[in-house]
Amino acid sequence: MTTFLGNPVTFTGKQLQVGDTAHDFSLTATDLSKKTLADFAGKKKVLSIIPSIDTGVCSTQTRRFNQELSDLDNTVVITVSVDLPFAQGKWCAAEGIENAVMLSDYFDHSFGRDYAVLINEWHLLARAVLVLDENNTVTYAEYVDNINTEPDYDAAIAAVKNL
């Protein structure tokens, strides 16, 4: 059972598992351009999915993955939330993180539904980490049961480094 703020929450759709092919998406970047999975073709991808960049745990998660994985060759960390692109950009500027890929599902929540992370009761995204290989195959998946807690950074980072 997944909880948010101590309460059970529900989702629509089926969570991706190791071996699944990731769904394409169309998300809004901080410059308001549209980004799809194809924009990151040929790269290893870490989808760091968070409820809101303006919370402590989400901020920590975003900072940690970007700090620890930004130097890996052929790897991109993609942070996804339903925050407005302006808020995502403001956070990056305040944190001094210049090369973070921040994408927003604010417009139609299609990413949240397709990846089964849209919290029905709150219309926020649940906390999850998905590692995709260069062919968009899921090689690591963690859907955090208590959304108010951090993911298993070490396991996710090891999964990327082992690709």
Curated annotation (Swiss-Prot):
CDD domains for the chain:
PRX_Atyp2cys
InterPro entries named among the record's database cross-references: Redoxin, Thioredoxin-like_sf, Thioredoxin_domain, TPX, Tpx_CS, Tpx_Peroxidase_subfamily
Show where the Thioredoxin domain sits.
16-162
Q: Name one GO molecular function term.
A: thioredoxin peroxidase activity
Q: What is this protein's function per UniProt?
A: Thiol-specific peroxidase that catalyzes the reduction of hydrogen peroxide and organic hydroperoxides to water and alcohols, respectively. Plays a role in cell protection against oxidative stress by detoxifying peroxides.
Q: What's the miscellaneous note?
A: The active site is a conserved redox-active cysteine residue, the peroxidatic cysteine (C(P)), which makes the nucleophilic attack on the peroxide substrate. The peroxide oxidizes the C(P)-SH to cysteine sulfenic acid (C(P)-SOH), which then reacts with another cysteine residue, the resolving cysteine (C(R)), to form a disulfide bridge. The disulfide is subsequently reduced by an appropriate electron donor to complete the catalytic cycle. In this atypical 2-Cys peroxiredoxin, C(R) is present in the same subunit to form an intramolecular disulfide.
- Family to which the UniProt record says this protein belongs: Belongs to the peroxiredoxin family. Tpx subfamily.
Give the protein name, as stated in the record. Thiol peroxidase
Q: What is the lineage of its organism?
A: Bacteria, Bacillati, Bacillota, Bacilli, Lactobacillales
